[in-house]
Design a protein with these regions (language model features):
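N-terminal beta1-alpha1-beta2 module of alpha/beta enzyme domains
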Residues: 1-43, 133
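Acidic (Asp/Glu)-rich catalytic clusters
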Residues: 3-7, 29-40, 60-71, 149-150, ...
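Conserved, mostly hydrophobic/aromatic
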Residues: 5, 9, 32, 63, ...
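Hydrophobic faces of well-ordered beta-strands that scaffold small-molecule active sites
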Residues: 13-15, 41-44, 71-75, 135-138, ...
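Active-site-adjacent beta->alpha loops and helix N-cap segments on the catalytic face
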Residues: 22-31, 161-176, 295-299
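Alpha-helix-loop-beta-strand connector modules within alpha/beta enzyme cores
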Residues: 23-46, 50, 98-101, 105, ...
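Active-site mouth loops of central-metabolism enzymes
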Residues: 46-53, 129-140, 193-196, 256-268
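An alpha-helical appendage that flanks or caps ligand/catalytic pockets
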Residues: 88-125, 166-167, 171, 175-279
Length: 308
């Protein structure tokens, strides 16, 4: 698959680390690095809860030894799949401290830290690592967006596709960057969904990720004007630890909301949405395909991109 993605012309391959819901990303990214020569390879995303920051530094450094400057570390606070481990997403301070510790370890420093979520005692890597390995932060809520603007090399933006909403999110990133006295980092927007000429099928396949927003990032429901009663009902019926398990909650959402928050339509519709995102000012657009035929959506996304 990695070879096909590279041959198709994609620039990035991101793999998730989602506790029990996905295979280990570092092993798969190492295989992808061996099979490709151009693809940028990263986690989207790991977190400081299921993996100690020191072990994340080791894993990222190892990937960089294999993939060279194509390696990227994507990290976030964690999400609902942590529930299966009896854990909760990291608090903002814990995420910020983890990023700082990882960077210091990659730079060859000895690190002692006593943070809310982890401890390090004179810890240092026993091998050389890439101090300049890019760190991308996954963000959706306003405070995490501001943190990403302040400290990240790139932002993995999870906010749907509505241009006004994306601008709102970018403003939060810019606020954080401005306070830190630095330019806006790279903006990598992630869009989930299905591209199919059968639009009802595409909408049905994308409903599950649309239900993620009322549960995890409800501010976007307010920004696009979703009825608060629908938001409440979706939150109450969202029972799965992973968005793919949220079928009952997703069925409550109107089509208009699904198509603003996810890729859910035919090639013409998606091409128009990609053109709007280009105008907003994101640096890269990344598709996370859903549905039964994910490769079909990847290929359709490539067709849409080539129309621009």
């Amino acid at each position: 698959m990695a070879r096909h993605i590279e041959a198709t012309g994609f620039d990035n391959l991101w793999l998730t680390e989602s506790s029990l819901h996905a295979r280990d990303p570092y092993q798969l990214l190492a295989l992808a690095a061996r099979a490709t020569t151009q693809l940028r390879l990263g986690t989207a995303v790991t977190n400081p809860v299921t993996r100690h920051p020191a072990l994340t530094a080791v894993a990222a450094a190892t990937l960089a030894e294999i993939a060279g400057d194509r390696a990227v570390l994507g990290i976030g606070a964690g999400d609902r799949p942590l529930m299966a481990l009896g854990a909760k997403p990291a608090r903002l301070a814990e995420l910020e401290a983890a990023i700082a510790a990882i960077r210091r370890l990659l730079a060859g420093e000895s690190v002692t830290a006593d943070e809310p979520g982890f401890r390090l005692v004179d810890a240092h890597l026993r091998f050389d690592a890439r101090a300049d390995l890019p760190v991308f932060v996954s963000a959706s809520g306003p405070r995490t967006l501001e943190l990403a603007g302040a400290v990240a090399d790139g932002v993995i933006l999870l906010c749907g596709l509505d241009p006004a909403v994306v601008r709102w999110a970018l403003d939060r990133v810019d606020e954080g960057a401005s306070r830190a006295g630095r330019p806006r980092p790279h903006i990598a927007i992630f869009v989930y969904g299905v591209i199919d000429e059968d639009e009802p099928a595409a909408i049905a396949g994308a409903r599950s990720i649309a239900a993620w927003f009322p549960q995890t990032a409800p501010i976007y429901c307010d920004l696009v004007g979703l009825d608060p009663e629908i938001t409440r009902a979706v939150r109450e019926s969202y029972s799965g630890g992973e968005f793919q398990e949220a079928a009952q909650a997703a069925s409550l959402l109107p089509v208009s909301f699904v198509q603003r928050m996810a890729v859910a339509g035919n090639r013409d519709r998606v091409t128009a949405q990609l053109a709007e995102l280009q105008q907003v000012g994101v640096d890269s657009i990344n598709i996370l395909p859903l549905g039964d035929d994910r490769m079909a959506t990847i290929n359709a996304f490539d067709e849409c991109w080539r129309r621009l």
